[in-house]
Amino acid sequence: MRANVLKRKLTLRIKRKKRIRAKISGCENFPRISVFKSNRTLYIQAIDDVKAVTLAAVDGRKLGVKANKEGAKKIAAEFAKTLKVKKIEQAVFDRNGYVYHGVIAALAESLRENGIRL
């Protein structure tokens, strides 16, 4: 029973992800910021969909932070620094099918606080 529930949740998240990706895309000056959340850490990257290139990425494991709100704020601050070095000040936020609540919302708000317009 539990396996079916987890499989259904994953299936629904992937459907949301595809629906979102059909509507948004990024370019070099206005990249798509994609978030992946695992049980232990967060991954965030800026993607140019026109050239299919990752412009910048931050891995939560390398920073030694957990996948909670405090960790999301630290990752977002580091990612904002990386984007500012590359002179990227605005982007499209791709929540990757996750609900905009908790860790994902904290990450987006921290990016905004650090000067990235989403």
From Swiss-Prot:
UniProt xrefs under Pfam families: Ribosomal_L18p
Chain segments annotated as transmembrane: none
Record-linked InterPro entries: Ribosomal_uL18_bac-type, Ribosomal_uL18_bac/euk
GO cellular component: cytosolic large ribosomal subunit
CDD domains, sorted: Ribosomal_L18_L5e
GO MF annotations, alphabetized: 5S rRNA binding; structural constituent of ribosome
Matching Gene3D superfamilies: 3.30.420.100
The entry's keywords: Ribonucleoprotein, Ribosomal protein, RNA-binding, rRNA-binding
Positions of disulphide bridges: none
GO biological process terms held by the UniProt record: translation
Matching NCBIfam families: L18_bact
General function of this protein: This is one of the proteins that bind and probably mediate the attachment of the 5S RNA into the large ribosomal subunit, where it forms part of the central protuberance.
UniProt record similarity statement: Belongs to the universal ribosomal protein uL18 family.
Protein name (Swiss-Prot/TrEMBL): Large ribosomal subunit protein uL18
Natural source organism: Campylobacter jejuni subsp. jejuni serotype O:2 (strain ATCC 700819 / NCTC 11168)
